[in-house]
C-alpha cells in the first residue's frame, strides 16, 4: 500500500487533509481491529475443534469488541495446567459439581448426592472429599466466567486501590512510594512506571485491593439462587473462587493494563518530545566548533565548515586530572582565529559544566562568537558505529563524536537520523517500555519529520534517505552509489535508473526529494511529479511562468487564484482544492524548509551558576523535556529547572504538551532554588 507520509501529503482529498499523526492513529486502530478479527476466528476454530462451539457462543465471540472480551470467552475452553479442578474432574466429580451448581428446586440433599461419587481408588474416600472436589470445579467455573470477569474488572477499575510499601527502609529514589495508596482509576502513568521499576528492583511490594463488600455481592447474586438446598455450598465455592482464582487473575490483568496504558502514554510522550528535537531550526552556513567534554580522555574538538565538512580536530585537557586550562584556551583561540569560528556547540555530558565556563570566559575576547549546549545523547553510539567509520574514516572514535555534536547544531535532523531514536533520550522510563513498540512509534516520528522537511537528493546521507517515504536502507544506499558513479541527479525522473527503484517506489518518494541543481524548478519543490502539469496550468491561468517561480515573482499568486475562484481553478487544473493550496505554497517558496518558520536556537555568550539564581529572577530558557507532570527548562546554569504543570498557565490543562514542546524558547520566573539537591523550581505563568 501507500506510505503514511505519501497519503498525508499527496492524497488529502481522500481523507479530508488529516495529518500524519492522525493517520498513524488510524493505522494503529486498523491493525488492532484486524488482529481482533484474526483472534476471533482462531478462538472459534479452537473451540469448534473440541466440538463445543454452539450458536450462542459463536455470536458472543463475534460481538466481542476487545481482545480481552475474546480471551474471557475462550478461557473455559483453553488447555490448562493441572489445577485442583482438573484433578477433581479426573476423579469423576464433574457431574456432581454441575448438579450442585444448577441448584435445582427438587435437588436431593447434597451429602446424599455426594455419597454416590465415593471412589477410594481415585482418592474420593469420603463425602467431604467429594464435596471439596466439586467446590474446586465450581470455583474454577466462576473464575472462568466471562460475565464474572467483566463485572469484577469493572468494579476494580472503579473502586480498587493500588498500594505500594517498602521492602526495606533504606533510602532510595522510591521513597515517595514507601507508603503509597491511590485509586486504580486515578493512577498516573509515571507513578505506574516508577512503582513497577521499584518492584522489579526489589524495593517495593505492590498490591491491588478492593473491598469484599464491593466485589462479592454481585458475584453471589450472579451464581447463588437463594433458598435452594445447595445455595450455601455454592456461596462458599463462589467466595473461594473469588479469593483464590478470580481476584488474583483480575489483579494481574489490571496491573498489566495499567502498565500497558502507562507504556503507551510514555511512548506518546517520547514521540512528542522527539518531534520538536528533530525539527529544531538548523544553524546553517556557519563555521562551527564541536566540543565533546571529558575528563581523563580530554575534551575533543572538531571544526566543521558551513556544510559540515571537517576542517580540523584537536584534543585539549583543561579538566581534571590534567587542569591544563591555559594551554586549552590558547588552542581554542588559535582555532577560532584560524577558521573564523562563529558558533561553538558543547555536548551536555561529562565535564560539560566546566567546559561551558571555560568557553564563556574565552569568548569574551571574541564578540562575534556564541555557544550553545547541545544534547549529545546517542553521539557516542553513532561515533562507534559502522556508519561513522564510513563517513569519517581516519578519525578517532572520540573525535567523530565532536564532529557529530557540531553537525547537530548545523542540521539537527540530518545528524540525528544517524542514531537510533531510542538513544536520543528525551522520554520517561524508555528502557522499561516494550522496545519493539517504542522503535515502531519513534521510527514513525523520524519518518514524518524527514518527509515534512524533504531531502536534497544530491547531498543527503543514506541514513536520511532511508526515512524518505517508500525508500529502504537498500534503495537509499543504491541512490548514493548511483550518485557516486554517475555524478549528481539533474531530474527526479533519473531516480528510475537506480537499481531496485521502480515506478511504485518512485511514486512514493519523488515528491520528498529535492534537486536544487535541476533545470526544472519544480524538482526543487514539494510538488509531486504527478502534479507538474497542474502546477504549470495554474501558472498559465494566473498569467505566470516557471521563470517567475525561479525569480520569486509570484507575490500575487494567491490573490489571482482567489479572483478566479479556488474551486474553479482546482477543477481547471485537474486537482482537488487541498492539492491546489499545497501547489500554491510550494510555488511561492520553492525549496522552503518548515523548520525556518520556528524560533531560532538560543545561542549564549555568558554562563551562570546555580548560586547566582535568586527567587523572582526572570530568565529566558529552552524547553529540554516535556513529561506528564511538567517540563524541564535549560536556563544556562547546567541544571535544568522544573516548571510544574500547575506553573505553566492559569487555565486547566491535562498535559504540558498542550502548551509546550521541546525546543520552545520561554520566559521563566525562578520560584525556588535548592543548591544542595540541585533543584530549581520555575514558573512560566508568573514570568508574564
Protein language model regions, located:
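Short, ordered loop/turn segments at secondary-structure junctions
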Residues: 10-13, 101, 211, 293, ...
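A glycine-rich phosphate-binding loop feature that marks nucleotide/adenosyl-phosphate handling sites
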Residues: 154-161, 291-295, 349-354, 374-381, ...
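Single-stranded RNA-binding regions, centering on S1/OB-family and related RNA-binding modules
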Residues: 515-519, 523-688
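Duplex nucleic acid-engaging cores and interfaces of nucleic-acid transaction enzymes
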Residues: 6, 19-25, 32, 36-290, ...
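Structured, non-catalytic alpha/beta "coupling" segments that mediate domain-domain communication
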Residues: 46, 60, 71-74, 198-213, ...
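Long, highly charged, low-complexity intrinsically disordered interaction regions
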Residues: 9, 28, 34-52, 62, ...
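Feature marking long nucleic-acid-engaging regions of large polymerase/nuclease enzymes
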Residues: 2-17
Amino acid at each position: 500500500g501507500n506510505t503514511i507520509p505519501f497519503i498525508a501529503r499527496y492524497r488529502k482529498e481522500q481523507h479530508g487533509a488529516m495529518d500524519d499523526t492522525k493517520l498513524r492513529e488510524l493505522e494503529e486502530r486498523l491493525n488492532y481491529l484486524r488482529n481482533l478479527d484474526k483472534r476471533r476466528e482462531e478462538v472459534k476454530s479452537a473451540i469448534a475443534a473440541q466440538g463445543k462451539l454452539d450458536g450462542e457462543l459463536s455470536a458472543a465471540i463475534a460481538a466481542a469488541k476487545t481482545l480481552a472480551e475474546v480471551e474471557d470467552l475462550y478461557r473455559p475452553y483453553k488447555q490448562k495446567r493441572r489445577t485442583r479442578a482438573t484433578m477433581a474432574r479426573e476423579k469423576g466429580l464433574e457431574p456432581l459439581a454441575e448438579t450442585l451448581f444448577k441448584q435445582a428446586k427438587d435437588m436431593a440433599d447434597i451429602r446424599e448426592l455426594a455419597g454416590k461419587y465415593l471412589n477410594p481408588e481415585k482418592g474420593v474416600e469420603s463425602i467431604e472429599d467429594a464435596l471439596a472436589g466439586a467446590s474446586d470445579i465450581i470455583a474454577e467455573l466462576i473464575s472462568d466466567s466471562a460475565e464474572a470477569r467483566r463485572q469484577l474488572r469493572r468494579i476494580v477499575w472503579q473502586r480498587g486501590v493500588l498500594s505500594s510499601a517498602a521492602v526495606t527502609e533504606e533510602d532510595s529514589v522510591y521513597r515517595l512510594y514507601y507508603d503509597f495508596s491511590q485509586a486504580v482509576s486515578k493512577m498516573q502513568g509515571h507513578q505506574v512506571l516508577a512503582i513497577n521499576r521499584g518492584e522489579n528492583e526489589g524495593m517495593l511490594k505492590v498490591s491491588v485491593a478492593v473491598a469484599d463488600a464491593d466485589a462479592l455481592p454481585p458475584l453471589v447474586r450472579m451464581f447463588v439462587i437463594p433458598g435452594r438446598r445447595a445455595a450455601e455450598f455454592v456461596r462458599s465455592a463462589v467466595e473461594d473462587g473469588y479469593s483464590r482464582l478470580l481476584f488474583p487473575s483480575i489483579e494481574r490483568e489490571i496491573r498489566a493494563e495499567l502498565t500497558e496504558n502507562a507504556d503507551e502514554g510514555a511512548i506518546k510522550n517520547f514521540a512528542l518530545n522527539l518531534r520538536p528535537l528533530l525539527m529544531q531550526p538548523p544553524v546553517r552556513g556557519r563555521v562551527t566548533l564541536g566540543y565533546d567534554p571529558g575528563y581523563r580522555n580530554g575534551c575533543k574538538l572538531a571544526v566543521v565548515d558551513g556544510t559540515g565538512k571537517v576542517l580540523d580536530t584537536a584534543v585539549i585537557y583543561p579538566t581534571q586530572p590534567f587542569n591544563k586550562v591555559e594551554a586549552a584556551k590558547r588552542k581554542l583561540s588559535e582555532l577560532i582565529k584560524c577558521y573564523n569560528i562563529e558558533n561553538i556547540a558543547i555536548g551536555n555530558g561529562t565535564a560539560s559544566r566546566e567546559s561551558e565556563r571555560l568557553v564563556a570566559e574565552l569568548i569574551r575576547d571574541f564578540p562575534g562568537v556564541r555557544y550553545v549546549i547541545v544534547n549529545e545523547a546517542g553521539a557516542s553510539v553513532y561515533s562507534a558505529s559502522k556508519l561513522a567509520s564510513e563517513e569519517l574514516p581516519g578519525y578517532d572514535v572520540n573525535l567523530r563524536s565532536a564532529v557529530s555534536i557540531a553537525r547537530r547544531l548545523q542540521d539537527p535532523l540530518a545528524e540525528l537520523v544517524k542514531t537510533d531514536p531510542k538513544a536520543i533520550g528525551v522520554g520517561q522510563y524508555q528502557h522499561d517500555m516494550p522496545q519493539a513498540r517504542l522503535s515502531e512509534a519513534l521510527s514513525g516520528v523520524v519518518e514524518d519529520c524527514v518527509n515534512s522537511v524533504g531531502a536534497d537528493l544530491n547531498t543527503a546521507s543514506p541514513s536520511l534517505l532511508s526515512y524518505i517515504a517508500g525508500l529502504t536502507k537498500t534503495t537509499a544506499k543504491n541512490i548514493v552509489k548511483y550518485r557516486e558513479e554517475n555524478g549528481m541527479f539533474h531530474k527526479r525522473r533519473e531516480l528510475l535508473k537506480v537499481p531496485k527503484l521502480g515506478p511504485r517506489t518512485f511514486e512514493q518518494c519523488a515528491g520528498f526529494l529535492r534537486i536544487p541543481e535541476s533545470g526544472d524548478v519544480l524538482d526543487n519543490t514539494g510538488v509531486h511529479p504527478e502534479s507538474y502539469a497542474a502546477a504549470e496550468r495554474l501558472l498559465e491561468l494566473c498569467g505566470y511562468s516557471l521563470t517567475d517561480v525561479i525569480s520569486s515573482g509570484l507575490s500575487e499568486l494567491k490573490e489571482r487564484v482567489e479572483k478566479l475562484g479556488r474551486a474553479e481553478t482546482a477543477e481547471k487544473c485537474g486537482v482537488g482544492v487541498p492539492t491546489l493550496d499545497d501547489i500554491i505554497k510550494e510555488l511561492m517558496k520553492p525549496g522552503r524548509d518548515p523548520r525556518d518558520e520556528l524560533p531560532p536556537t538560543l545561542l549564549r555568550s555568558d554562563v551562570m551558576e546555580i548560586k547566582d539564581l535568586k527567587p523572582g529572577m526572570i530568565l529566558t530558557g529552552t524547553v529540554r523535556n516535556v513529561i506528564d507532570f511538567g517540563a524541564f527548562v535549560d536556563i544556562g546554569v547546567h541544571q535544568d529547572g522544573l516548571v510544574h504543570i500547575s506553573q505553566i498557565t492559569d487555565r486547566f490543562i491535562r498535559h504540558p504538551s498542550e502548551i509546550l514542546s521541546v525546543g520552545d524558547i520561554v520566559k521563566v520566573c525562578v520560584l525556588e532554588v535548592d543548591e544542595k539537591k540541585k533543584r530549581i523550581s520555575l514558573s512560566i505563568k508568573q514570568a508574564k
